[in-house]
Amino acid sequence: MKKFLPDLIAILAFIILSFAYFFPADIEGRILFQHDTAAGVGAGQESKEYLERTGERTRWTNSIFGGMPTYQMSPSYDSTTSLKGVEKVYRLFLPDYVVLTFIMMLGFYILLRAFGISAWLAGLGGVIWAFSSYFFILIPAGHIWKFVTLAYIPPTIAGVVLAYRKKYLLGGIVTALFIALQIQSNHIQMSYYFMFVILFFVGAYFEDAYKKKELPHFFKASAILALAAVVGVCINISNLYHTYEYSKETMRGKSELKQEGAAASQTSSGLDRDYITNWSYGIGETLTLLVPNVKGGGSGSTMSQSEAAMAKANPMYNGIYSQFPRQYFGEQPWTAGPVYVGAFVMFLFVLGCFIVKGPLKWALLGATIFSILLSWGKNFMGLTDFFIDYVPMYNKFRAVSSILVIAEFTIPLLAIFALKEILSKPDTLKLKENRGGMIATLVLTAGVALILAVAPGAFFSGFITTQEMAALKQALPAEHLAPFVANLTEMREAIIASDAWRSFFIIMIGCLFLFLYQQRKLKASFTLAGIALLCLIDMWSINKRYLNDEQFVPKSKQTEAFVKTQTDEMILQDTTLNYRVLNFIGFPGNTFNENNTAYWHKSVGGYHAAKLRRYQEMIDHHIMPEMQETYQAVATAGGQMDSVDASKFRVLNMLNTKYFIFPAGEQGQAVPVVNPYAYGNAWFVDKVQYVNNANEEIDALNDILPTETAVVDVKFKEQLKGVTEGYKDSLSTIQLTSYEPNRLVYKASTPKDGVVVFSEIYYPGWQATIDGQLVDIARADYILRAINVPAGEHTIEMWFDPQSIQVTESIAYAALTLLLIGVMVLAWTQRNKIAKKS
């Protein structure tokens, strides 16, 4: 027990720090109101109600975008139940928010202990990694999946380290377990980025093994890790496989639309190039790693919120500074805050580049540079283009600036290695070979901070963005433009200088601790404690700028967002089994950026990062233009739909949009408007018009009346048995008789064979029967379903229950069994070792 006492103390310290940061909100039960979290609640309400009512999970919901799979809405599979139990134990059953910081610290601590670092130094490492500013920016933004995935990456790499340190079985089990946990956390982008880090590590261990003539050991460890990776992946195979299949149909998949000219270069098997690089870190902005507000801070902060800036403000413009411009003046469209790793941490990292020996140092330095260069995105397009075009899967992810998480990992890791070198060898910095490195480190960190403090303009050519200048020219009289720009420049220089002085003095204080230790004036334990306190104060205070107690609200605030309004009540009085609602409140920006509507209704709009690509293309080509026409027409008609031209919104009608929610008054009130022109749940058509490609298909919708003609790609001609003429008259009827999100039942009657179009979103995996006999489903009108229905009276049933889930679940259970066997073997061998010692 005594052996594990330092570890228990470190874990207890992590718990105390986590509770302390979120005090008193954690004690009072207050929560953060997070847009992404609230959006998830709204989008998932139909699925939640179905689970509570039936005890089964639906893999399809009609709550947003007309309908989509639930694979990326809190994905859950039976095979992961036991894994979630293990996760709860690992988290020590700590409450929300508190647990996030705790697992972030614990994961890095495990990694450092795997390297053989002392518990006390590993504890410091856990703190400086976990308190990197980016993580505390993720929490209020609601990017919890990303946060948790990042928390499980250091212990995953710990397994890699253990395996290469010849603890094969333990390393394999740890790797498999934490790969499984991070994939379960469902942010593949972060896992993908850290695959590059692992490759750097493997390269370093290969070099080390080659030099030591231990290549058999290297290949043995690599084989075990490869098996562990397969096990970890297979535990989550249900999620991974269905996410992969789904991604092909989303904006991350390849569009079938052919574009010409410059736009054609954007078309690939992944996201558009501009979309991928829209959030690119500025080259000069990289200095935020050392000085947090080197680009002003966050986009959400006005100039009036900065004391340093307002000390330089011209009182004449104070009213403007309370609204515009924002503190941030970097190259990203918007940012909640900078990526800051700690001034003295950065100092130790740079110092580590000189005093730490071995291939692992070069791996960490290489990974850091790699991360920074790729984070520049459109500001460094040579490398970015290469990765988008040639590196598998890189073009599936947007916001390239987020690859800086690699630097946030490698910088504190090398910093701890450097501190270990210093504390274990007090004369390290006295050595002649290290003096130059120490001087260079001071110049590159404290020196840069000092220059930024004294002359911020030395690194930047301007402090006003192009967009700001354009807005100022529109807003200000010509005679005020130059004085205002000069004053704003002075204020932004003051913001930079304030934080630069801060970083400079933090580095100097840290160096003082090292100097006193080197002079034998301070013991190693006190030096470590002093540095730990310095780093904690530094990073804690920066993080409080972006996540503080004022942001926490009572839990009731979350539910208030979904309180049923009078408009909702009025719409819900409609007992029709299935129809859609289109919310015009906040149009045009809000319709596809909120899920409050989806909480109570089946929405045409919605918010999700991975919507179906064809639906997005319909939004761009038809839905948004029709919304503009409809908004203007309904407003002009004063809500009297009988005087509105229904031909202006045929796509909305074919989506069975029965209700529009329109703003009424200036206090956020809304009113429902019944759309009498909605086509209903399904209809027979007179004609099937086959087209050769997606462009013809989406363009044809401009020229046809969907209730009469169905536009179908020739690829689906066989599914409709080549029918070109449908059959539609007053005797042909079809009615929805039963509705579940994943199962629809219709009664149809027709004197002759005909084609029925359903106002449901087409997606591979939906199956259909007519009177119990399987039939094919075709795609019609770009996004809808169609079936060839024979003459007579029939029951048509459609359901979504992919058989692939059963297959992948079997694989997942087999992988879990392998992991359990590994744990049992490890426990047995450890028990035998203990028995032999006794």
Language-model features: where?
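Conserved luminal/periplasmic juxtamembrane motif of membrane-embedded glycan-processing enzymes
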Residues: 2-747, 753-757, 761
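Active-site-proximal, structured, solvent-exposed surfaces of multi-pass membrane proteins
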Residues: 347, 658, 705-838
